[in-house]
Amino acid sequence: MTLVTEVEAQAWLREVLHVDDASMSRLAHLVDLLLAENERQNLVARGTLPHVWVRHIVDSAQLLHVSRETSGSGEWLDLGTGAGFPGLVIAAIQSDRPVTLVDSRRLRTEWLQRAADALELSNVRVILSRVEDLESGAYAAISARAFAPLDKLLAISARFSTPDTLWLLPKGAGAQHELQMLPESWHHMFHVEQSLTDPAAGIIVGRLLAGKQPAPHVSRQQAPRKGKRT
């Protein structure tokens, strides 16, 4: 199934993901904030704005459906979050779940903090940092929306992961190719789910097993430095 219209997208959130009225209200407010801010800085491509519920809200929220985690309490880490997708959407739906949003661009992190404040999302932490400089830690889920090639992403981010950490990585049309570029011994740890918002796009889902860190073919990064918080 591929969602096409804004009506279909909102119906899917309510009927399939069972998003409650309070969360739907927060998502609608987020859309309004995004549309206003996009006039000041290019958060998302203008061509996607007429389909913002499909292209950004459901495209983010589907990670909860793909992971079968419609509820959860473990901290979620969203790397290279940009305009807050998927992390800000996750936080709006699961408002009791801690969500950390990381981006290296000050304008983006300032916007994220303003949006989180406007939505009264006390579960959101915004960090201004490159991923390589971010303080290590263990997270329940890690997302990154088209942030970096899979092998590089795993190399620089494995230190945020345990064998129980769920990775949810929207990758567009190149998802299967990126997975195949990993050594064959890694393939069983990840699989590709089809996106609900684009029939050509895939989401890489899986867990890193113990002893499989960092990712192959990429050198270990220098010791991390603690990132700045906004």
UniProtKB/Swiss-Prot annotation:
It catalyses: guanosine(527) in 16S rRNA + S-adenosyl-L-methionine = N(7)-methylguanosine(527) in 16S rRNA + S-adenosyl-L-homocysteine. InterPro entries: rRNA_ssu_MeTfrase_G, SAM-dependent_MTases_sf. The keyword rRNA processing applies. Gene3D superfamilies: Vaccinia Virus protein VP39. The keyword Transferase applies. Its EC number is 2.1.1.170. It is an enzyme of class 2 (transferase). Belongs to the methyltransferase superfamily. RNA methyltransferase RsmG family. Specifically methylates the N7 position of guanine in position 527 of 16S rRNA. This is Ribosomal RNA small subunit methyltransferase G. The gene is rsmG.
